[in-house]
């Protein structure tokens, strides 16, 4: 491991955009949130690629790279590469005493990890905590993907079984298109998002409110017209 990034090695060889609007709910206190629940909330919208498709995408990815952090495709179809994870922790995590490591608590701190396509979200979280000798359970943290479209920012929590390097490959190397964020898993949903994300949620809610209001007006306008027609039939002279 160099001072610039961490590396995640795997022994085994066999091993994409929605706005999250369910940010009002909190996780039940004292009960861990299962991976299956996460999968149900955040459905994976991608299907895995064939070896030829992966080869083509890796080639295009490397052509677009500007920071020399390229991907490498192995003969067995597994590829390795780099992801950058931004630390957005509300409080400093517990670390080993006299660890000599920098604290990961600095808001906005960026870390680069060298991983393979087989590494899951859960393994990436463990690698980040191990890098800083954090003694807290990985279950207390969650990895989010943050996507940017025009002037809007979307974020959703990834399930522990998803593969970050695959998401990076599909999205391309630009972090202004897709980025990864580590946050506390148990924090309230309101506090877990940045100001631009919350502002985007407000825009979505305002739009939904306006649509519901227009639907309600159309419904009662149609009801009024039918009622007036019925009254005219009743009072029509014989």
Curated annotation (Swiss-Prot):
Boundaries of every SARAH domain copy: 187-234
Residue ranges occupied by any Ras-associating domain in the UniProt entry: 79-186
PROSITE patterns attached to this UniProt entry: RA, SARAH
SUPFAM superfamilies in the cross-refs: Ubiquitin-like (SSF54236)
Skewed-composition ranges (Basic and acidic residues): 38-48
This protein's record includes keyword Cytoplasm: yes
Record has Magnesium as a keyword: no
InterPro entries: RA_dom, RASSF1-6, SARAH_dom, Ubiquitin-like_domsf
GO biological process per UniProt: signal transduction
GO molecular function: identical protein binding
Span list, region Disordered: 26-48
Coiled coil residues, start to end: none
Any one cellular-component term (Gene Ontology): microtubule
Keywords: Acetylation, Cytoplasm, Cytoskeleton, Microtubule
Domain of life per record: Eukaryota
Tissue: Widely expressed.
Subcellular location: Cytoplasm; Cytoplasm, Cytoskeleton
Modified residue annotations for N-acetylserine: 2
Record's protein name: Ras association domain-containing protein 3
Source organism of this protein record: Homo sapiens (Human)
Organism lineage string: Eukaryota, Metazoa, Chordata, Craniata, Vertebrata
């Amino acid at each position: 491991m160099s001072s610039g990034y961490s590396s995640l090695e795997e022994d085994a060889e066999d091993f994409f955009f929605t706005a999250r609007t369910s940010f009002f709910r909190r996780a039940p206190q004292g009960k861990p949130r299962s991976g299956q629940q996460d999968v149900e909330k955040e459905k994976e919208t991608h299907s895995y690629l064939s070896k030829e498709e992966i080869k083509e995408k890796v080639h295009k990815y490397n052509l677009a790279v500007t920071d020399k952090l390229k991907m490498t495709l192995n003969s067995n179809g597994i590829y390795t590469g780099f992801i950058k994870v931004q630390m957005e922790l509300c409080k400093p995590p517990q670390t080993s005493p006299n660890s000599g490591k920098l604290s990961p608590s600095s808001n906005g701190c960026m870390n680069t990890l060298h991983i393979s396509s087989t590494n899951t979200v859960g393994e990436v979280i463990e690698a980040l905590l191990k890098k800083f000798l954090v003694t807290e359970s990985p279950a207390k943290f969650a990895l989010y993907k943050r996507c940017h479209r025009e002037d809007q920012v979307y974020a959703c929590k990834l399930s522990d079984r998803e593969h970050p390097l695959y998401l990076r490959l599909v999205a391309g190397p630009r972090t202004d298109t897709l980025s990864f964020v580590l946050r506390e898993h148990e924090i309230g949903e309101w506090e877990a998002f940045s100001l631009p994300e919350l502002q985007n949620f407000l825009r979505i809610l305002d739009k939904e409110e306006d649509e519901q209001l227009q639907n309600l007006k159309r419904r009662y306008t149609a009801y009024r017209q039918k009622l007036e027609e019925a009254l005219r039939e009743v009072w029509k002279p014989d």
